[in-house]
Amino acid sequence: KPQQKIMKKIILITGGERSGKSSYAERLAHELSASPVYMATAKIWDEEFRRRVERHQQNRGPEWTNIEEEKELSRHDITGRVAVIDCVTLWCTNYFVEQPEVSLALEALKQEFDRFTAQDATFIFVTNEIGMGGVSPNEVQRRFADLQGWMNQYIASKADQVVLMV
């Protein structure tokens, strides 16, 4: 029996911290696939965080394929799969730390996003909506907010569906 071809789909889930974005993304992925992929973009910076990541992986269950990738999402072939990418904010951070020039970091992120989403898969991106809290007095934070906001806009412009969690 021929395998049914997945139609490429991009979904962006945005909202504030602790708004239920990740839980919603995971539920959605589970509805769409019996064996979804979870791509974590977080950099593991200490043992406590490592334990937290392991706890999250165990809570998701054995049907999930867990991938840790800080920057180069396109290195992973997820053709035909449903993937949660959690999260865009940390992914942007990983680029910004290495390239604090916002325009260059943004261009690198857009290129990587386009390479990654060229695959025939369902992509569920989770991001923080950081633009609703006012302007930071800190110049580095303002630059990062610009990067994050512009990347969110870019993903939203490519998305088939955008969900705001409140």
Residue map of PLM features:
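Conserved P-loop
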Residues: 8-77
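Helix-adjacent hinge/juxtasegments
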Residues: 62-108
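Short, Lys/Arg-enriched N-terminal segments with co-localized hydrophobic residues
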Residues: 1-6
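Glycine-rich phosphate-binding loop signature in dinucleotide/nucleotide-binding domains
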Residues: 32, 77-81, 118-120
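Residue-level signal for inorganic ion chemistry
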Residues: 25, 56, 84, 128, ...
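Short, well-ordered beta-strand core segments
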Residues: 36, 83, 161-164
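Structural motif
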Residues: 12, 82-84, 124-126
